[in-house]
Amino acid sequence: MAAPRTYLAIDLKSFYASVECVDRHLDPLTTNLVVADASRTEKTICLAVSPSLKAYKIPGRARLFEAVQRVKEVNAQRLQTAIRQKKAVRGEDGRYHFASTSFDASALNADPALGLSYIVAPPRMQRYLDVSTQIYKTYLKYVSPADIYPYSIDEVFIDVTGYLPYYHMSAHELAMTMVREVLYNTGITATAGIGTNLYLAKLAMDIVAKHIPADKDGVRIAELDEQSYRYLLWNHRPLTDFWMTGPGTVKRLEAHGIYTMGDLARFSIHGEDRLYEIFGVDAEILIDHAWGYEPCGIEQIKSYKPSTNSISEGQVLSTPYPYDKAKLIVREMAEILMFRLTEKKLVTESITLEIGYDRENVDKGGYRGLTQTDRYGRTIPKAAHGTIRFDAPTNLGSTLINESAKLFERITDPALTVRRITLNANKVTPDEGFYQVDFFTDTKKLEREKKLQQAMLGIKNKYGKNAVLKASSYEEGATMRQRNAQIGGHSAGGSAGGSDGKLQK
C-alpha cells in the first residue's frame, strides 16, 4: 500500500479584485470593488467581486447589471435607515438621498445611514499574470516546481509530503507560512485546504474553510482526510459544491434519489452497475469521490498526455451581429487559429464551428424554429454547429479561413442575429511539413504561403499582434484589433499601479 501523502490547495482570495485594491492602496477585505469592463455593456461579466461586496449576496461571476441591481436594493434599505435617523438629505424635488456614501465596509458598518458605493475597475490581465508569477515564485522558495501544479491563475496544488519532516512543520504550519509570506509580499490573502489526496485538499479549501472563522488577515485553513470528509460532508448540500460535480451530473443523480455524497456512497455498494449504466466510465470517479478517494497525484497529472488535442477560439459579441458581420468575425477567428497553429508548429485535421444566436430573435416574436434555454433561463434559438474535415492536416490560412467561411454559410440562418461564436481546430498534431498533392497541386505556392505566415508571425511577435493586419480588420464590427490587445478575452491593461476605475453610487 502506498505511503500516505499530504496535499495543499491554495486559492488567492478574490484575486483580480484584491490586486486592484492593493494597487490603489486600499484594503482588499473592506473595499467594495468589482472587476468588469464597463465600457462594453452592463451585461458584461464581473471577473471578480471583492469579499466585502460578496457579503451583500453578489456572486463572484455576476453580470454587471446584477451587481448594479443588488446595490440599488441594498441602498433602498439603507436610505430608509438614513431617513429614520434624520441623516438623509431632501432634494428640491422632495426626494431623499444620502448625505454621503462610502465604498469601505468598515465605514458602512459603523454608520448604517451611509450609502453603499463601489469601484468598477477595468480588467488588467497582464498585471494579474505578473502578480501570479510573483506569488508562484514565493511558493518555489519552499517546494520544488515538480511538486506544484498551477490549477489556474489564482489556485495551486502542492504535494508537501516530503517537506514536512524537512522543515519540522505540520501541514497547517507550512501552509500558514507560505500564505503569510504571500500576504506580506503582495497584500493578498489566501485560503488553503489540506488533504490526504488532491480531491480532499480541494474540498477542504472550497467548502470546509468557508465555514470556519478567518483570522485577522482573512486567512482560513481547513483539513480533511477520508474519515473527517465522511463525517463533515456526506450530508452536505448542494452537490454542485463538490469539485467536478456539475449541474447535469447532479440532475441525473437526483433523478435516482441521490442528493448527497453519503447517498451516492451508499448507493454504490449495491448499485455500482447502475451508476456505470448512467455515467459510463465517469462512474468510477463519482464513486471514488463519494468515498473520499482520489488515486491521481501531481506526478500523474503532469505526465498525462491526452490522446487528442484541439485549439479553440471563442468570443461573445458585445451586441447582436447580423449575418455578414458575424461572417467577418468567423474569418478573423480562423486567421487567429492559423497563427496559433503556425507558432506551435501544428496542423489540424478538421474545424468545428458553433454559432449561438441572440435572444432578440425570439423576443421580437417572428422566430418559429427550434429553441433552447440559456444559463439565465431565457429562450433563444437553438445553436447551429457543424464540422469540415480536410483532405490532409493543414495550418494554411487560405484553407482555414475559406473553409470556415463556407462552414458558416452552410450552418447559419441569415435571418438571425448572432451573439456567440466558437471555432475549434480538432485533432491537432505536429507539422511534419508534408502535403497531400495531386497533379493540380502547386506545391511552390503552398510553400510560399507557409513562409509568408511564418514571416507575419515573426513581425507580430516582435512588434505586437496589430503590427500586421488585413484591411477587413478595419471594417465596422471587426474585433481582431481589440482582441489582440486582450488576454483571455479581457483587457491586458497596464502593469503596476492602479488603473482608472469608476466609483458607482
Label the predicted regions.
Residues T189-T191, T352, R420-T422:
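Residues at or immediately flanking beta-strands
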Residues V156-G162, A384-D391, Y435-T441:
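Short, hydrophobic beta-strand segments
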Residues M1-D288, P295-I298, T443-K505:
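Gly/Gly-Pro- and Ser/Thr-rich, intrinsically disordered tail segments characteristic of DNA damage-repair
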Residues G162, T196, Y357, A392, ...:
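Non-catalytic surface loops within mature trypsin-like serine protease
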